[in-house]
């Protein structure tokens, strides 16, 4: 992000970063990073849905224009009565995330390693993206062998077949296609997320359910 931000500034443009998935999971330094705008979402950190925040740096203040006009709330950028209870809850959620950041990050990395080690025994299971340059809690996994169908796990594991912001589309993920997958491989991809309340038992149970489904559900898998 710092490298991209520096390049953007050299061309006089503003740099916005969507930090919804990263906040509370990776270190963010707005004091040093050349970022002009950064957006956050409360529910990604166990806060309420329907509330977020936008960091506006000094370079962006004079160029940002209001889209909702009226009473001039929120520094004149977004008029309308403030949702005080949601704002307070978001602040509390972010404070808790900051307080337990190091502890939770270490736990999530340990659980992720446990999950990946066990999934490595499943033929054709592939981790999408970089193994190191990634957020720690979310995994995109493609099962390229057999007749894998994610519907086989619907009754036992909470997972996603796409990003939440793209869930209404039946088209293959353009991100997976850009990574080199074809449409069939993209359809055999699931996303698993680890969180504050995930346990080792959850990891072991999920892997066992996936293995069992591979072996006992030929109509769906192979």
PLM region spans:
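Pyridoxal 5′-phosphate
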Residues: 1-222
């Amino acid at each position: 992000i710092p490298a991209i931000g520096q390049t953007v500034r050299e061309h006089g443009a503003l740099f916005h970063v969507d930090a919804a998935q990263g906040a509370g999971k990776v270190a963010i330094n707005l004091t040093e990073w050349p970022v002009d705008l950064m957006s956050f979402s409360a529910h990604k950190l166990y806060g309420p849905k329907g509330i977020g925040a936008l960091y506006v740096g000094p370079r962006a203040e004079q160029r940002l224009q209001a889209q909702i006009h009226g009473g001039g709330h929120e520094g004149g950028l977004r008029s309308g009565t403030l949702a005080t209870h949601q704002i307070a809850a978001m602040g509390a959620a972010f404070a808790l995330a900051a307080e337990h950041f190091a502890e939770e990050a270490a736990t999530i990395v340990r659980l992720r390693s446990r999950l990946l080690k066990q999934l490595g025994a499943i033929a054709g299971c592939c981790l999408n993206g970089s193994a190191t340059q990634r957020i720690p809690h979310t995994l995109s996994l493609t099962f390229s062998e057999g007749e894998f169908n994610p519907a086989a796990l619907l009754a036992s594991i909470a997972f996603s077949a796409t990003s939440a912001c793209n869930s209404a589309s039946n088209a293959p993920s353009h991100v997976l296609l850009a990574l080199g997958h074809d449409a069939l491989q993209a359809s055999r991809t699931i996303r698993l997320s680890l969180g504050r309340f995930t346990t080792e038992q959850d990891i072991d149970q999920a892997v066992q359910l996936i293995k069992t489904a591979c072996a006992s559900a030929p109509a769906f898998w192979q």
